[in-house]
Every structure is written in C-alpha cells, then in structure tokens.
C-alpha cells in the first residue's frame, strides 16, 4: 500500500488526489493529510496562534472527510506554521512514499510565494508532486 503525505492549506477533495496520482492508486493508498497552522503576520506579532490552529483543524478535518467519502483511506494532522517543518515532523512518524503539495491559485496562503515546493523537493528524499486545485 502506497503511503502519501498530503500538505494542504485549504480543504481538498479526494477527486483532486485521484486526478493527481490516478483513481486506483489513490483508492489503494493510505493518506496522511497535514494542514499547517499558517499564521498571518499580524497574528504572529499579537502572539495569538489559536485562529491559525483552529483553521488548520477545520482544513484537515474537511479534507479527511472528503477523501473518505470518495473511498480514500485518510487521517489528519495539524502541523507547524512553517510548511517545511510540518512536513519534516510528519515524516518523523509517517513513512511516506510520496509527498503531494496542494495549492490554490487564489489563496493568500500560497506555498509558491515562499518557494516551499522547490525547498521540499530539495530537502526530502520522497518524490514531491505539486498540484494546483480550484476551491
């Protein structure tokens, strides 16, 4: 069984994963959904991480529910605010075969701005796939 680590900043459907890696492969995979607790800069300065944690919890729960409804074995986890640290922490306990980074074209939480996709590909031994999905 293939193990996939999916990093999401917004809720993602099982269909998005199926279109990314193939329907059969997605339905036979075990997926760990990681939603980083992404802080807006002003929240960081106010030292109030709760809204970011609450949002990450919502994102991972909704993503896991969507994937399970579409026949994908998924579990969720809230990660560090730094997406690379969130991936690193998850990989310490979850032996993923592949990392899939989901971004949204209009999201203010885009990992692209910070070069997260390229950095993840350089840092981790697993193949990294980047998928842009509509909301």
Residue ranges and their predicted role:
Residues 2-47, 130-133:
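Small/aliphatic-rich secondary-structure junction motif
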Residues 3, 98-100:
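Structural motif
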Residues 48-57:
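Glycine- and acidic-residue-enriched helix-capping/strand-helix junction motifs
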Residues 70-98:
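Structural beta-alpha unit
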Residues 102-119:
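Glycine-rich, Arg-bearing micro-motifs that act as flexible, cationic patches
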Residues 122-131:
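Glycine-rich, aromatic-bearing surface loops/beta-hairpins
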């Amino acid at each position: 069984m293939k193990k996939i680590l999916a990093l999401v900043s917004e809720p993602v459907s099982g269909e998005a994963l199926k279109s990314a890696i193939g329907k059969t492969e997605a339905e036979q995979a075990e997926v760990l959904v990681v939603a980083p607790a992404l802080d807006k800069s002003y929240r960081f300065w106010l030292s109030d991480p709760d809204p970011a944690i609450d949002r990450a919890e919502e994102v991972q729960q909704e993503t896991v529910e969507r994937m399970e409804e579409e026949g994908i074995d998924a579990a969720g986890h809230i990660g560090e605010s730094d997406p690379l640290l969130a991936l690193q922490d998850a990989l310490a306990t979850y032996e993923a075969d592949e990392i899939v980074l989901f971004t949204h074209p209009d999201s203010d939480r885009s990992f692209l701005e910070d070069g997260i996709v390229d950095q993840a590909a350089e840092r981790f031994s697993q193949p990294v796939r980047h998928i842009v999905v509509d909301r």
